[in-house]
Each structure stands twice: as structure tokens, then as C-alpha cells.
Amino acid sequence: IGKWLVDYYPQDMEVYTEAFGGMFWCYFNMDLSLYPNLKKIVYNDFNPLNYNLFKCVQNPSELQRALDSIPVQQLGVSNTPGEFRDRFVEYQTEVFNSGFTANSPDYLTAAKYAYVVTQVFSGSKPETSSFIDLKGKYRCKYLSFRDKLSKPDWVEHFTKITDVENLDFEDLIVKYDSPTTYHYVDAPYWKTENYYSNHDFDRQDHERLANVLQQVKGKFGMSYYDFELLHTWFPENQYKWERKLFAKAAAAKKNTKQNMGEELLIMNY
């Protein structure tokens, strides 16, 4: 879905922000050569573990060294040693229950966090999910992430991130807003807020987001699932609405009908 979204990005932007950065997938889908005026790339996430991970990603070689220091389950080894599950539980308990705050890049904590989130089912809550024993059938996603830290195209994206923030979305948008800013907003979806890790996001926050976006000087694109109040906050005769059907990967099961969803992109341009 990221490739579909970035097709709508204005190519004359000078500042790019994601107030709900998550894993920054839309940014990583951008062909940076198409944005010759882009001077500032801003990642933000209210989750301090995501914030710390992306502070570390700005120095990919140092983060790669931290990831290399932690053994992980291997392709072709069907009898996964118990130490990997034990390490997963240890790191899961440590990073999610410690009240972690990062004032400077903490590479080892970033590696431990990556160890957990790459070994749970896609779309699940990493703080409560169980370890996936791949039984040697697949390559661990932890290793795939580690490899990206030395691949030129990925390294270019990592090192061009200019600012990493741990702010409330409104503070982030106001701080970086300008006539040449593009805000991509992927807010927690309506009625699924408790699904997201390390923060709450309620009806009041959805309305607060709508209010701040209505006042920006720059351009914004916001992805959501459709719900009734959106039509009040962003009337279709005042904002551009685009829709796309997509397969819900997290809900897909073998030999069953694919579960489909509709992604909605609302723009002020």
C-alpha cells in the first residue's frame, strides 16, 4: 500500500514529516531522486522504543554491530535451540516493562527491540506476543533487517533522515509546518487505538488531529479506514478523497479467501 500512497506525494516538497512514523514504510517506498528540493526528513513516534530505533538507524553501521552481537535462529536448523526463545522472553520483558526512555541512541536496546518485533506474527502486539519458532524453514526477519543496514539504497534512506522526534503528533506537525512541508499522517485507525503499542489514542485525539490538519500551511495526506465523522471533519467537496482495496496481510491464511480492506487517503491538495 505504501507504493500507492507515495504516488500522490508532491515532488516539490522541502520538508517531509510522518507524525505517526511507526516503521516509516511510506518513506522507505519513496524514490528520493524524485524530490530534488527535499532538505529535511522528519521521523516521529510517541513510542520511545520506535524513537530510539530510528535514532540508531541514522548510524546504520553502529546499529548493525549491535545486531551482530546477538545470536538468532537460523535457516536450515530445524531444531531451534531453546536459548533463542529464552532470549526473546528476556528481551521482551526488559524493553517493554522498564519504562524505557532514550536521551541518546541506545544501540543495544534497539537491537533487543528489533529481536522481539521481528520474531512475532506481523500485525500482533510485540509486548504480549509469543516467540515464533521458524523451525529452520524460513530466514529470520531479524537477519533481513540487519542486512538492510548495509545495502546502499537502504543506507541512503537511513542516513538522509535529518530529525527523529518523540513528540505528540500536534506538537510535531506545528513544529515542522511550513508552506513547503508535506505531512504524511497514518494515525491509529478509528476504534483500533488500543491495538497500538505504548500509547493511547481516543476520539478526542482523532478530532484534535483533524483540527490541526485543517490549519496547516503545508500539504497533507492522511490515510484512514472510513468512518462517519471523517465526512464531517474533511468534507469531500473540500478535500480530495482516494480509495484503494488491499489484502490484509496480517489476516491472511493459507487456502482461505483473502480478507480485503479499503485504504482511504484524504488530501488538502
Stretches with model-predicted labels:
Residues 1-4, 60-184, 188-194, 211, ...:
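SAM-dependent nucleic-acid methyltransferase catalytic core
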Residues 5, 54, 114, 220, ...:
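A residue-level signal for conserved active-site and pocket-lining positions in enzyme catalytic cores
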Residues 8, 12-93:
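SAM cofactor-binding core of SAM-dependent methyltransferases
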Residues 12-16, 38-40, 158-162, 214-220:
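Short active-site oxyanion
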Residues 25-29, 50-53, 122-125, 173, ...:
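Short catalytic/ligand-binding loop motif for oxyanion handling, primarily in non-cytosolic enzymes
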Residues 41-43, 164, 240-243:
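Conserved beta-strand scaffold positions in the cores of enzyme catalytic domains, especially
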Residues 198, 202-269:
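Long, positively charged, glycine-interspersed low-complexity recognition regions
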